[in-house]
């Protein structure tokens, strides 16, 4: 009985130590908007912007941690590394805004 308890405790510890798989959160740039404009992610996830527009755009963090140029019909990405509330915009079209909520 004691061995069974030790084995179960060891398995629980290993399961708790395995991190969840990182996800990719996609934002499409189209018609001078970010779609969706608000997304949620976890630390370690990747945010991918896909420019489906015929114009160049950017995804520029208002805190100046990143500034990504997005050519027409191309994509760019950033991996979020800490819990945060991130507001971003397109520096070519400042009315284009988005928000990323990053949780642990």
Regions found by a protein language model. Name each.
Residues 2-13, 18-104:
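Extracytoplasmic copper-binding redox domains, predominantly the cupredoxin/blue-copper superfamily
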